[in-house]
Design a protein with these regions (language model features):
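Phosphate-bearing ligand-interacting subdomains
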Residues: 271-273
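Active-site region of glycoside hydrolase catalytic domains
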Residues: 1-211
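N-terminal subdomain of nucleotide-sugar transferases
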Residues: 212-259, 263-268
């Protein structure tokens, strides 16, 4: 397709903006019925907010023929138990796209992770992967909010392990473990963690912890291991005037005693750490 943005906007533009995206009208013009002004008046009604489910996304690039194409993920890319990629960046950019395109408050109506949850010998369910997932996704949502996105609410999928569409009881998305044979419930570690997220209004998220340890890496290792921008985009360690985003330490940093921004040590110089 010439423009994949209307994957969502084909359905949302008529409702929120009062017209269909031009890309879709052009591509499907020979198949579409006549769309009248009366149709659009009926479709485009006043609404108070937009609700959107966001779970993951995929990398796309321009192919040799100028058309968009999917980019294969490297081996070992993190995935959920149902084989969905873990992509908090897609959550961030999805929120930004929606709130910039549609001038209404946004609610995330679904987001969560299926894990291989098991009851441990201590009788508890230690779903650390889910905590890591939620920490990164909710942190991405806060980042979008801090940058001006009008996001009003977030609904985690889900409270209890349940019947998940065509996958039945195989996928466990809940914060509370359900033994489907006995109906016994066990509160998972993620539920206690999420309770703290609510109680502290996100204060326990890793992005809000001032005790986060600064990463001092050799410049060569930074590029070879982490990649040119991963420290900036994933860990938010930025130094003023550093377009790479790497924080290597005073001796290695090209800007010398730089000032940190967008992390728990915001405003401090490297020499003050």
């Amino acid at each position: 397709m010439n423009n994949w943005t209307w994957n969502i906007s084909w359905f949302s533009d008529p409702v929120f903006l009062g017209h269909y995206p031009k890309e879709g009208l052009e591509k499907f013009k020979e198949y579409l019925p006549e769309i009248t002004e009366a149709d659009m008046q009926l479709i485009h009604q006043p609404l108070d907010f937009m609700g959107q489910n966001i779970y993951n996304g995929y990398y796309v690039r321009q192919g040799a023929d100028g058309e968009p194409e999917f980019v294969d993920r490297e081996p070992g890319f993190p995935k959920t138990a149902c084989n969905w990629p873990v992509t908090p960046k897609a959550f961030y950019y999805g929120i930004k796209f929606l709130t910039e395109r549609y001038p209404l408050p946004l609610y995330i109506t679904e987001n969560g992770m299926s894990c291989h949850d098991n009851v441990s010998f201590d009788g508890r369910v230690h779903d650390n992967d889910r905590i890591t997932f939620l920490d990164s996704y909710i942190g991405a949502m806060q980042r979008a909010y801090d940058e001006g996105a009008d996001i009003r609410g977030y609904f985690l999928w889900t409270f209890l392990d349940n019947f998940e569409w065509s996958e039945g009881y195989r996928e466990r998305f809940g914060m509370i473990y359900v033994d489907f044979m006995t109906q016994r419930r066990i509160v998972k570690d993620s539920a206690f963690w999420y309770q703290d997220v609510i109680g502290t209004n996100g204060g326990n998220l890793s992005m809000n912890q001032t005790t986060k340890e600064i990463l001092f890496l050799d410049p060569v290792c930074t590029h070879n291991i982490w990649g040119g921008t991963r420290l900036r985009e994933d860990f938010h360690y930025l130094v003023e005037g550093d377009d790479l985003g790497e924080c290597w330490g005073i001796s290695a940093h090209p800007n010398g005693d730089g000032t940190l921004r967008d992390c728990g040590f915001r405003g401090m110089k490297l020499s003050e750490l």
